[in-house]
Amino acid sequence: MDSNTVSSFQDILMRMSKMQLGSSSEDLNGMITQFESLKLYRDSLGKAVMRMGDLHSLQSRNGNWRRQLSQKFEEIRWLIEEVRHRLKITENSFEQITFMQALQLLLEVEQEMRTFSFQLI
């Protein structure tokens, strides 16, 4: 995932905000912050996969690493469910497209995190 992915997600959330979908800007900023945090975590997983020495150190810290990974998956699942919920309650087709784009990005990030984490396990 690159900075374009984060920018795309921010653009989508800003469009949501401008459409006044009942989401406060505080909620949307929180979603952007969580998404950026997940992006950084996903990037760190990718870097760890590339460094062989880290695999051994990750295995030695396995319990803590698995708890952290579990927490990150809970965060992204929450974001996915939040976007799905908003998608279900909106009737405007433009808003639905915006939510679909946000959902697609979140699902892509979740898949990338899963791919890297399975390589590390």
UniProtKB/Swiss-Prot annotation:
An annotated GO BP: exit of virus from host cell nucleus through nuclear pore
Locations listed in the record: Virion; Host nucleus
InterPro entries linked: Flu_NS2
Keyword flag Repressor: no
Superkingdom, natural source: Viruses
Extent of motif Nuclear export signal: 12-21, 85-94
Keyword presence, Transport: yes
Entry similarity comment: Belongs to the influenza viruses NEP family.
Further comment: Average number present in a viral particle is estimated to be 130-200 molecules.
Function: Mediates the nuclear export of encapsidated genomic RNAs (ribonucleoproteins, RNPs). Acts as an adapter between viral RNPs complexes and the nuclear export machinery of the cell. Possesses no intrinsic RNA-binding activity, but includes a C-terminal M1-binding domain. This domain is believed to allow recognition of RNPs bound to the protein M1.
The protein, known as: Nuclear export protein
Organism, as annotated: Influenza A virus (strain A/Chicken/Pennsylvania/1370/1983 H5N2)
